[in-house]
Amino acid sequence: MTPGLLTTAGAGRPRDRCARIVCTVFIETAVVATMFVALLGLSTISSKADDIDWDAIAQCESGGNWAANTGNGLYGGLQISQATWDSNGGVGSPAAASPQQQIEVADNIMKTQGPGAWPKCSSCSQGDAPLGSLTHILTFLAAETGGCSGSRDD
């Protein structure tokens, strides 16, 4: 065998092809992940409290009873603790407040705590959520995992 017949270029071709495939998959994954993060960030910014179907959350949280006071430390249709109510502009008891007053305080809670304040039921607020909004994403995820039935187990 003559020296020089096997070249490093010839031996490296399968490795180059594999490297290109791995690189392509990595880049495509990075692009998709970046788009998802950007979408989530934009949807959080553009998602307004008006996009939330508070009646659906109340139905999930308290069976739609806006005057709920079951003794579990959570009050009103949206099942808000007294401390959270007070720190977000509520006056008196959530159970004694009108649905509109509860929604106004809930809007403040949503701004500071996000949908995590209602971990199970916020994804049930399908309403007219814009495509890509946080409510839309949560609704989709809840539907996929079978959430949205019953009330929160606090």
UniProtKB/Swiss-Prot annotation:
What if the gene is knocked out? Not essential, disruption of rpfC alone has no effect on growth or survival in liquid culture, nor in mouse infection models,although colony size is reduced. Alterations in gene expression are seen. All 5 genes in this family can be deleted without affecting growth in culture, however triple deletion mutants (rpfA-rpfC-rpfB or rpfA-rpfC-rpfD) are not able to resuscitate spontaneously in the presence or absence of O(2), and are attenuated in a mouse infection model.
Show the SUPFAM superfamilies listed in the entry: Lysozyme-like
* UniProt KW keywords: Cell membrane, Hydrolase, Membrane, Transmembrane, Transmembrane helix, Virulence
As for subcellular location, the record says: Cell membrane
List where the protein spans the membrane.
Answer: 21-41
Q: Gene3D superfamilies from the xrefs?
A: 1.10.530.10
Protein EC: 3.-.-.-
Q: How does the protein's chain sit in the membrane according to the entry?
A: Single-pass membrane protein
InterPro entries membership: Lysozyme-like_dom_sf, RPF
The molecular function terms in GO held by this entry are: hydrolase activity
Q: How is it used?
A: Might be a good vaccine candidate.
Q: Which GO terms describe its cellular component?
A: extracellular region; plasma membrane
Q: Under what conditions is it induced?
A: Expressed in actively growing cells.
The GO annotation for biological process reads:
dormancy exit of symbiont in host; negative regulation of gene expression; positive regulation of gene expression; quorum sensing; regulation of cell population proliferation
| Major location (coarse) | membrane
Q: What class of enzyme is it?
A: hydrolase
Q: What does this protein do?
A: Factor that stimulates resuscitation of dormant cells. Has peptidoglycan (PG) hydrolytic activity. Active in the pM concentration range. Has little to no effect on actively-growing cells. PG fragments could either directly activate the resuscitation pathway of dormant bacteria or serve as a substrate for endogenous Rpf, resulting in low molecular weight products with resuscitation activity. Stimulates growth of stationary phase M.bovis (a slow-growing Mycobacterium), reduces the lag phase of diluted fast-growers M.smegmatis and Micrococcus luteus. Sequential gene disruption indicates RpfB and RpfE are higher than RpfD and RpfC in functional hierarchy.
Tell me which family the UniProt entry assigns to this protein: Belongs to the transglycosylase family. Rpf subfamily.
- Designated name of the protein: Resuscitation-promoting factor RpfD
Q: Which organism is it from?
A: Mycobacterium tuberculosis (strain ATCC 25618 / H37Rv)
Lineage, top ranks: Bacteria, Bacillati, Actinomycetota, Actinomycetes, Mycobacteriales
